[in-house]
Amino acid sequence: MNIVNSLDLSNITTNHVAAAVCAGIAVYAIVAGRNRGKKYPPGPKGHPLIGSLFEMPIQNAHVVYKEWAKTYGDMIFFKVLGQPFLILSSEETITDLLDKRSTIYSSRPRMPMVVELMGWDYTLGLLPYGERWRFLRREFHRFMSPTAVSNYRQIQENSVYTFLNNLVESPEQFSKHLRLFYGSISMKVSYGINVKSAEDQYLLDAEGAMSGFMEAGIPGRFWVDLFPALKYVPSWMPGAEFKRKAARWARLNDISLERPFKHVLDQLKKGVASQSVSATLIEELPDQNSPDRKEKETIARNISATTFLAGIDTIHSTTQAFFYAMAQFPEVQKKAQAEIDAVVGDKRLPTFEDRDQLPYVNALVKELIRWSEVAPLGIYHSTTEDDEYKGYFIPKGTIVMTNAWSILTDPVTYPDPFAFKPERYLKNGVMNPDAPRPEDLAFGRGRRICPGRYLADETLFMTSVGVLAGFNISPPLDKSGKPIKLKNERVGTITLTPPKFECRIEPRSPAIRTMIHDTAESISAL
């Protein structure tokens, strides 16, 4: 599917399109005149005015770009309606541009639908590079540095043990239990709120906001992303369905921002608030009579929401991929369980203190990050000034994508790339310091590297080791009792996830089943 097929054309009128096209042509003419004669990186030539509008893929874009790279190389350049795009498909180009020239390649492209109409301008990941971004990044780092993240380990362990008990009671609902699991960790860390159900209103609010983001965040999904002037069209006009959708999604976004933060404000006034990111930020606010109180409170609210939402969708998808992988690669599961049994024994469940003694499980987490690659093109970068690289001109405002999936499935670096092999990162039974580091691509690069990567890594480890200690995961059975072979497939656009699948999740022994239940009971009594 290309970008034209994916556009929401509901009720768009001829006048709207004509006006937008005229504006686009004017901008195109100005930019084209300024950059005429420049040597761009190789790529599809495109058509006059519209460029590669009909060639730019939406579905499986990472696969299409990998095919294009066979023709054009590790830098692919094209334009859509005058907007330049650059696809990077090698470690060398990503390092040279995003890391070594990060002052130029660290901004974000304009996203009229998501940012300007739906109100996602508060979130750190979508902010353009600048002083505001640097300030919020520093504030966010206070709560997501390796040292800060270590303070959340008890929350993570307790959440994992509760998740394991939910799997014991209703393993067929593991996807629902995953939603509750990650939502409960994020809600507890961000707001100090204990979430007990996947139908908790706080989680439903956040999921409503995220569903709008996932639909509208696809580049070019709506005409307004191609022609920003359309954002000024009144929402009551025929053809302005995108404005009405944006308004509905913006309301959901506002609710997910305001409701939990207001709860913490009220709890602090009563003196009963739990420790959390939002509680810390609120306690640091100036007096109510201070002239900048409102501004500071908004910043605290935004940082709290960013903490809650940071990576929740991608980590959820990665853990789904964990179950998907274990059901397909039983030999990996058995090796990991043998290591856990040797270190942890059968009298308790694993903790973070066991991590240094579990090299195979650590390698498994690395391979999970590579094999799942839930964000194959990451969040797009944008150049803030003209640049030249290897004799090629890269104009200001170019949208830059990194095809991490292509690199992480390169058979030269990762032989048999679609197999799940933790051994890639081991040497003589210990972690190999010279092995590839898939996390360096999966969590982004340069100054826009994911600030929540340490919490994500620890959560993935604790989830994986807990599930492997407690359960055997295997494919579902057909009517004759034979295992159904799972296909290694992915679905999605911005993020990828396994297609809807079933697997058997069974406690490894009656004793382990009892231990999981008793541990969860002791937590619920706290």
Swiss-Prot record:
InterPro entries: Cyt_P450, Cyt_P450_CS, Cyt_P450_E_grp-I, Cyt_P450_sf, Cytochrome_P450_fung
Transmembrane spans: 12-31
Gene3D superfamilies with a match to the protein in the record: Cytochrome P450
Positions with a binding annotation for heme: 450
Pfam families: p450
CDD domains hit by this protein: CYP64-like
Subcellular location(s) per record: Membrane
Cofactor(s) named in the record: heme
Annotated GO CC locations: membrane
Pathway: Secondary metabolite biosynthesis
Principal localisation: membrane
Presence of the UniProt keyword NAD in the record: no
Entry keywords, A to Z: Glycoprotein, Heme, Iron, Membrane, Metal-binding, Monooxygenase, Oxidoreductase, Transmembrane, Transmembrane helix
Lipid bilayer topology: Single-pass membrane protein
Origin: domain of life: Eukaryota
One GO MF term: monooxygenase activity
EC number: 1.-.-.-
Residues the record marks as carrying a glycan: 11, 302
PANTHER family: P450, PUTATIVE (EUROFUNG)-RELATED, P450, PUTATIVE (EUROFUNG)-RELATED-RELATED
Family (UniProt): Belongs to the cytochrome P450 family.
Function: Cytochrome P450 monooxygenase; part of the gene cluster that mediates the biosynthesis of alpha-cuprenene and oxidized derivatives. The alpha-cuprenene synthase COP6 is the only sesquiterpene synthase identified in C.cinereus that appears to be part of a biosynthetic gene cluster and is highly specific since it catalyzes the cyclization of (2E,6E)-farnesyl diphosphate into only one product, alpha-cuprenene.
Record protein name field: Cytochrome P450 monooxygenase COX2
Native source organism of the sequence: Coprinopsis cinerea (strain Okayama-7 / 130 / ATCC MYA-4618 / FGSC 9003)
Gene (name only): COX2
